[in-house]
C-alpha cells in the first residue's frame, strides 16, 4: 500500500479539522497511525511518500553515514525487522504520476544485539507522591574512535552533572524541612546517541512510574556552552524548546522561575515543530512528548566541538551554566509543588 504524508487539503484548509492539522498529519503520530490502519486492512507492506519527512530523515542518515554518530540502532521488538525509512528524491511526484509504477528492492540487514542501562532515582513527594515530574539527561556519548577519546563534556556531561546537582538540591531542601508535593524522577537515559533508545524504552515500553501520572518532563542536553551563531552577545541565555506546545501552564511556570531565580534570556528561536533543525525531535524529551507529556528541552546550542574529542570540560561556560541549572531546579520545584496538576492545552 502506498500513502501520502499528511492529509488532503480542501480550499486551503485541512480535510478533517479545517484550519488545524489532525492527528493524521501530526509528525508525532501519523506514521504509526497509518501503519496500524494499513495493517488492519490487510496491507502486507506500506510505502509512505512525504517530502517533509524526507528532509528530516535524510539529515539523520547523512549524519549516521558520516561515521560521527555511529550506526543506527533500534529497540529490539516485533517491528525490528521493518525498514525505518526508505528515501526517495524529495521530488517524489514523478513516482506518483506513473500508474504503472514498479520497482524492486534488495537489502541486507546485519543485526547485532546489545544491552545498556537507564539509571534512575525517585525523590518522593509529600502530598501527591503518585504524581511525578521526570528530569532526563542522556548518560552516553560516542566513545572512542580511531584511538581518540570523545570526552562529551557538553554532550552530555553538562546534562548529567546538572541532574546530579539538582538532585542534591532537592535532598538538601528535604533535610531543611522542605519537600515538594509531587515526586521527582531523576532519569539518566542511555543510547541517546544511537537514536534516543533509552528514553524510547522508558516511555514506550517499561516506565518506572505510570505515564498517566507523569505530569511533565524537563530534559537537559548540551547546555554548558554558547552557540557561535549568537555571536558574542549575552551569554546568559538558554534555548527553550517545547515549553508551550502541550501546556501553557508549563510555559508560564518556566517563565516565572526564570524571572525570580535565574534572570536568563530565554531564546525560543527553535521552539517550533517545523524548525528545519528539528531540535524538537532530536533529544530524549521527544518520547515523552509523543506520549502527551508536556516537556521542555533546555539547550545552549551546537558548537565547533560537537561530537569531537575537543568537547572538554575546560570549555564549559560555568556562569551561564549555573544559571541554567538554577532555572531547571526552580521549574521542577514549581511543577512539583503546585496545588493542581498542570493542564494540557
Language model region names:
Residues 1-76:
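Extracellular/luminal Protease-associated
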Residues 72-152, 168, 172-176:
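Soluble metallo-hydrolase cores and metallopeptidase-like ectodomains found primarily
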Amino acid at each position: 500500500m502506498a500513502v501520502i504524508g499528511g492529509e488532503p487539503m480542501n480550499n486551503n484548509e485541512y480535510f478533517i479539522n479545517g484550519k488545524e492539522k489532525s492527528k493524521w498529519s501530526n509528525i508525532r503520530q501519523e506514521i504509526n497511525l497509518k501503519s496500524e490502519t494499513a495493517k488492519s486492512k490487510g496491507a502486507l507492506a506500506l510505502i509512505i511518500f512525504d517530502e517533509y519527512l524526507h528532509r528530516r530523515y535524510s539529515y539523520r542518515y547523512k549524519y549516521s553515514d558520516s561515521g560521527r554518530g555511529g550506526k543506527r540502532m533500534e529497540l529490539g521488538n516485533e517491528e525490528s525487522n521493518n525498514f525505518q525509512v526508505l528515501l526517495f528524491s524529495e521530488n517524489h511526484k514523478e513516482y506518483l504520476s506513473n500508474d504503472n509504477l514498479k520497482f524492486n528492492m534488495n537489502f541486507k540487514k546485519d543485526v547485532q544485539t546489545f544491552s545498556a542501562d537507564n539509571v534512575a532515582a525517585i525523590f518522593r513527594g509529600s502530598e501527591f507522591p503518585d504524581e511525578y515530574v521526570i528530569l532526563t539527561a542522556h548518560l552516553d556519548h560516542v566513545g572512542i574512535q580511531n584511538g581518540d577519546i570523545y570526552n562529551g563534556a557538553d554532550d552530555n556531561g553538562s546534562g548529567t552533572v546538572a541532574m546530579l546537582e539538582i538532585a542534591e538540591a532537592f535532598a538538601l531542601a528535604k533535610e531543611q524541612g522542605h519537600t515538594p508535593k509531587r515526586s521527582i524522577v531523576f532519569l539518566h537515559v542511555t543510547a541517546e546517541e544511537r537514536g534516543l533508545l533509552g528514553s524510547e524504552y522508558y516511555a514506550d515500553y517499561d516506565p518506572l512510574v505510570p505515564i498517566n501520572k507523569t505530569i511533565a518532563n524537563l530534559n537537559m542536553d548540551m547546555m554548558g556552552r554558547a552557540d557561535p551563531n549568537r555571536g558574542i552577545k549575552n551569554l546568559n541565555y538558554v534555548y527553550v524548546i517545547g515549553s508551550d506546545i502541550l501546556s501553557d501552564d508549563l510555559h508560564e511556570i518556566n517563565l516565572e522561575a526564570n524571572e525570580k531565580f535565574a534572570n536568563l534570556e530565554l531564546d525560543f528561536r527553535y521552539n517550533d515543530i517545523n524548525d528545519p533543525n528539528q531540535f524538537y525531535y532530536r533529544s530524549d524529551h521527544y518520547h515523552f512528548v509523543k506520549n502527551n507529556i508536556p516537556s521542555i528541552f533546555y539547550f545552549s546550542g551546537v558548537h565547533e566541538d560537537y561530537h569531537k574529542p575537543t568537547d572538554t570540560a575546560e570549555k564549559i561556560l560555568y556562569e551561564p551554566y549555573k544559571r541554567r541549572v538554577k532555572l531547571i531546579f526552580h521549574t521542577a520545584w514549581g511543577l512539583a509543588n503546585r496545588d493542581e496538576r498542570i493542564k494540557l492545552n
